[in-house]
């Protein structure tokens, strides 16, 4: 018998399978909608979507014991690199109808894949834009509570800082999934992560750093706060 329990993070749930294994899930904001072929569980009249950590860096971080998760019900999120919406759909479940996600994506082709999802998930606003040029979408994005960045570029840290300068509320949080090989393939990942942490700490208070293996090789997730 499958069982669903509340996770320590509001809006996230733990699904305990028959064999005792645990997975994370979110309560489906749009019952009946599957976004990326994920498994769906029915429990006490509600529908829960299993959050696959192999397909989502944020999901991987939670599975790896993330301590700080500023994405909560009712919060506004600027999502840099929203892609086709795998992770964003779970964030959409969490923030709910009271929250909002402003999703920036550079590729028109990829953004088109998001359209059928957002037709029903009205709390996601898809925006075609370049995360390296935050002023481009100033007319569309207000000040937000959280910025989440998943952009595999050498200037990852600068992208977060530049967007936080324009869009992040004081006291707001940033989360960034850093792929060391996108920054410098010649250096050891640990060295790259230290350099990124140093760069981030010049603008933010760095609260947490977490390795994403075994789900993502050479990746770390940083949680930072704008003071």
UniProtKB/Swiss-Prot annotation:
Q: What is this protein called?
A: Fibrillarin-like rRNA/tRNA 2'-O-methyltransferase
Q: Which UniProt keywords apply?
A: Methyltransferase, RNA-binding, rRNA processing, Transferase, tRNA processing
One Gene Ontology term of the biological-process aspect is: tRNA processing
Q: Does the keyword Cell membrane apply?
A: no
Which proteins does it associate with, and in what oligomeric form?
A: Interacts with nop5. Component of box C/D small ribonucleoprotein (sRNP) particles that contain rpl7ae, FlpA and nop5, plus a guide RNA.
Residues the entry annotates as binding S-adenosyl-L-methionine: 86-87, 105-106, 130-131, 150-153
Top-level taxon of origin: Archaea
Q: Gene encoding this polypeptide?
A: flpA
* Chain segments annotated as coiled-coil in the UniProt record: none
Q: What is its EC number?
A: 2.1.1.-
């Amino acid at each position: 018998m499958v069982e669903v329990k509340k996770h320590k993070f509001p809006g996230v749930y733990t699904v305990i399978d028959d064999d005792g294994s645990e997975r994370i899930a979110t309560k489906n904001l749009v019952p009946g909608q599957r976004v990326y072929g994920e498994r769906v569980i029915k429990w006490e009249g509600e529908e829960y979507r299993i959050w696959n950590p192999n397909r989502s860096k944020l999901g991987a971080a939670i599975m790896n014991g993330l301590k700080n998760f500023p994405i909560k019900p009712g919060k506004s999120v600027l999502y840099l690199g929203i892609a086709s919406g795998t992770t964003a759909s779970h964030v959409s479940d969490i923030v709910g109808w009271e929250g909002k996600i402003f999703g920036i994506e550079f590729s028109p082709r990829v953004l088109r894949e998001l359209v059928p999802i957002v037709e029903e998930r009205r709390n996601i606003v898809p925006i075609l834009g370049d995360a390296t040029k935050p002023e481009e979408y100033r007319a569309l994005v207000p000040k937000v509570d959280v910025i989440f960045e998943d952009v595999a570029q050498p200037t990852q840290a600068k992208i977060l800082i530049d967007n936080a300068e324009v869009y992040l509320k004081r006291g707001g949080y940033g989360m960034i999934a850093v792929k060391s090989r996108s920054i410098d393939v010649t250096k050891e990942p640990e060295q790259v992560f230290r350099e990124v942490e140093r760069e981030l700490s010049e603008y933010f208070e760095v609260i947490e750093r977490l390795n994403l293996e075994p789900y993502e090789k050479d990746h770390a997730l940083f949680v930072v706060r704008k003071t």
